[in-house]
Amino acid sequence: MFLASADGEKVVYSSYQPFPQSKNGVGTQPYLSSRTGAGWETIAMGSTTLSPNPSTFDRVNAYDSTDDFSTFLMDTSAVLSPLDQDAQEIFPGFTLFYQDTYKQSVGAPPELVSRASDDVPATGPFTASYAGRSDDASKVLFQTGEPLTPEADPIPPFARYLYVREANGTTLVNVDEGGAMIGECGATLGDNWLAGKGATNAVSSDGQRIFFRVPDEEPRVAAGGGPLPPGCEVPPQVYMRDGDAVMNVSASQMETPDPIVAGAVFEAATGDGSRVFFTSGDRLTDDATPGGGLYAYDVDSEVLSFLSTGATGPGGAEVDGVVRSTDDGSHVYFIAKGQLDGSKGVAGGENLYLWTPGSVRFVTTLAAADVQEVGGEGLTGVAELREARITSDGSTLLILSRADLTDYEAEGTVQAYLWDEDGEMVCVSCDPSGDPPTGKATLRSKRGSAFGAEYQHDSRNLLDDGRVFFETTAALVKRDVNGTLDVYTYVPGGAAQLLTDGKAKYGSSFFDASADGRDVLVATQASLVPQDIDNGENDIYDVRLGGGFHPPAQSSCAGEACQGDPSSQPAAAEVGSATVNVPGSKDGGRRLLSSVSGRVDGYSVTVRARVAEAGVLSASGPGLSRARKSVKKGGAYKLKLSLERAAKKRLLAKGQLEIRIKVRFAPAEGSAVTRTTIARFRCGKKCTNADGRVQG
């Protein structure tokens, strides 16, 4: 788990080399570093192992945490509780302990989650894995093949039960209101992580509503295409547990239901659990096209809706799956091979669409290699597509693709693209000179263990103001000379800027960022400050607006001995505000006016600006009309400026015209902030109409 808190003041990460704070001294362990006035203070998560034969296999994998970083969820084979006794003696003198799920709050000992309701030690052997939680972690879900409650009937090998652990004990989730277990082949929270889909809001914020799939997918994976155990061959269905009530949300609501053949795949739910999105190859509503597609079930009204409308071909929508959705369910990005927005898109291609209430909008067509089938169903496989990001309101999408989504010829290399609801698509990682690509883009190469990746929080590569953080091996600026991975940032209307030094032999990678972009965490082997004297070990730096700490007194250490003192590792002062600052900003890092972009259309230009609070937004430029707007709250706003008569004459005479636009924001309190951008107008051969673009 690699993650920064929303305010950038806390960072959690893992290290296979033990720090002095480590209580085990062996195996990978998570650490929590908190920023103080004097530096970073670090604690190790996970108490001293009680195993009689501790080893490097006793790794502690932190997969999740509450938003305030007060509680962590971990899987480990290390023995962190006296109740953890699911062991097996392999040979005399060596006892193997199996993986269990733990919950640990800062300052408290770890609590064994994967156990029965009583406090009798589990003697196993059995393996458990973390599945999900409520926002406050008062309810934690885990999966295991071990029957821990009376309702847990026998299931086939590799199948797993789904349990929820809370203060009053452990409960089987996949059980109906009469107390009978649902299905004969276990259950999965949300959907299988091998399919490349995480359990997006499969547990509501309060933990009251839990979405799960029956049967469990593990027996199918283990069978490898061979015959399935009894009870595992049935089409999967999506269920919801709401307190003691359980319902099949993917059940057909057709007046005369068709036979269920394909089954359903959970895609996402809203944060409060009021709506769930799933895909199915079956027609489940009377208005659904052949082959089914994307559906939404409203919990309160108990109404099932077909969302992937508009297909006219015989194959219907042919939905592959959901890429991203907002927490409130107002925006859902999904892939479909059908043409759902008139003639837009490519029939049979990997078309990306945006669903909003009442409409399906075509975004772009991705490369076939961007969408890959693994395990036989749904949007699966490739990490590039799963790494997509959206803003909290869903208006902006950041995606990786091998396709040429702009005029730039990427020659099949993976590049990062930014799309917004105005229809503008920008390649943020492409070579600004237009030369052929010399490298590929990634969003976060350091993801930690592949196991449990579905639980890992998305890194903040896309901020709500449109700023982007990405990695690339290409040199997008002259001072990037190492020929390997470096971290860049992109501000809408501007150009990519290098955040790391561009000189580190083994490159640098993006770790995470704070929600406001003030702190950008990067990992590098380069020594960016004098205090980093560990001879090239991988370190985490905070590239921070306002800089870091004053250098402490020199300590005498070398090599790995210095690795154990992260509390003295400062933020990267020399790479701080000078690199991250928005070009043209004079707000001292407050980011009152965080981004400016626009579009030329004929003889006018529409400027978009994002502001942080209430105030007056204005724009002007020589030869342009002035525009002014009072705004009552922070957000994105548009101002339209038109060419004056004299400027039109110059454009018609010369064929092109460049005007620098000054955008000014005056907050209700405090000093005004200004940004500039350049609008380039051009006209055709006859100069009877004009077109152009805006460049920051």
Please provide the spans of the model-predicted regions.
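Glycine-rich loops and low-complexity Gly/Arg-rich segments
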Residues: 452, 521-523, 546-547, 652-655, ...
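Short edge beta-strand/strand-turn motifs with a hydrophobic/aromatic core
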Residues: 640-645
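Short glycine/proline/serine/threonine-rich loop/turn segments at secondary-structure transition edges
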Residues: 531-533, 647-658
